[in-house]
Amino acid sequence: MERHQHLLSEYQQILTLSEQMLMLATVENWDALVDLEMAYLKAVENTANITISSCSSPVLQELLRQKLRSILENEIEIKRLLQRRLDKLSELVGQSTRQQAVNRTYGQFPDQALLLGETQ
């Protein structure tokens, strides 16, 4: 029984961390998300050797299935939010690169008073 309780506790810890990571991704707190991801990966690693099939209790197996389902749903949503952030960063890098090219081009003309993006 104690082993079952320990197993359930391990999965609950992973689920809690997963929910916290989802909340951080939702509010776009990327630095905190990366920091928390290390704890999440460690918790997953700690439970890697324990499998649902090794549990004899059908009730415990169902509880763990529910937790795993929730964890996987959180993972999918976190990945979606991270992809959206990556797309935004790629767009910003592209804009910056184009702006630098324009500024270099216009900067070659000595009679040009202002570079694009500068104010008088």
UniProtKB/Swiss-Prot annotation:
Compartments where located: Cytoplasm, Cytosol
UniProt record, GO biological process: bacterial-type flagellum organization; negative regulation of bacterial-type flagellum assembly; protein folding
The protein's name: Flagellar protein FliT
Gene from which this protein is expressed: fliT
Subunit structure: Homodimer. Interacts with FliD and FlhC.
Species name: Yersinia pseudotuberculosis serotype O:1b (strain IP 31758)
Keywords for the protein's UniProt record, in alphabetical order: Bacterial flagellum biogenesis, Chaperone, Cytoplasm, Repressor, Transcription, Transcription regulation
Required for homodimerization, as annotated region: 1-50
Tagged with keyword Transcription regulation: yes
Recorded family membership: Belongs to the FliT family.
Stretch list, region FliD binding: 60-98
Function: Dual-function protein that regulates the transcription of class 2 flagellar operons and that also acts as an export chaperone for the filament-capping protein FliD. As a transcriptional regulator, acts as an anti-FlhDC factor; it directly binds FlhC, thus inhibiting the binding of the FlhC/FlhD complex to class 2 promoters, resulting in decreased expression of class 2 flagellar operons. As a chaperone, effects FliD transition to the membrane by preventing its premature polymerization, and by directing it to the export apparatus.
Origin: domain of life: Bacteria
